């Protein structure tokens, strides 16, 4: 049996937020098709970017407090792997 991910209790909330983002992205595509004003399109892109960043940061927080904490408590090579994995995820988020 595999262990539950840290976000499992919030899965419905994340799915709802991501469906909202999906709708926003479709709206942006429609704006482009309809030749909407550039700044209006950019404003919507900024909103989507912020929404995705919020989801990513919440997922990262749950990963750190659940998956990484559990691996560190258990010790061994799994802990080092989880720490390296978290560090790489943070680096990707900072670069984006």
From Swiss-Prot:
Binding-site residues, Cu cation: 38, 63, 67
Assigned GO CC terms: cytoplasm; protein-DNA complex
Subcellular location: Cytoplasm
Induction: Negatively autoregulated. Induced by copper.
GO biological process, one term: response to copper ion
UniProt-recorded Gene Ontology molecular function terms: DNA-binding transcription repressor activity; metal ion binding; transcription cis-regulatory region binding
Disruption phenotype: Disruption of the gene results in the constitutive expression of the entire RicR regulon and hyper-resistance of the cell to copper.
Matching Pfam families: Trns_repr_metal
Cell cycle among keywords: no
Transmembrane segments: none
InterPro entries reported for this sequence: Metal_Tscrpt_repr, Metal_Tscrpt_repr_sf
Keyword list, A-Z: Acetylation, Copper, Cytoplasm, DNA-binding, Metal-binding, Repressor, Transcription, Transcription regulation
Modification N-acetylthreonine occurs at: 2
This protein's record includes keyword Cytoplasm: yes
Family: Belongs to the CsoR family.
Function according to Swiss-Prot or TrEMBL: Under low copper conditions, represses the expression of lpqS, Rv2963, mymT, socA, socB, mmcO and its own expression. In the presence of copper, RicR dissociates from DNA, leading to the expression of the target genes. Members of the RicR regulon are important for copper resistance during infections and full virulence in a mouse model of infection.
PANTHER family, A to Z: COPPER-SENSING TRANSCRIPTIONAL REPRESSOR RICR, TRANSCRIPTIONAL REPRESSOR FRMR-RELATED
Additional note from the record: Constitutive repression of the RicR regulon by a 'copper-blind' RicR results in extreme copper sensitivity in vitro and attenuation of virulence in mice.
Protein name: Copper-sensing transcriptional repressor RicR
Organism this protein belongs to: Mycobacterium tuberculosis (strain ATCC 25618 / H37Rv)
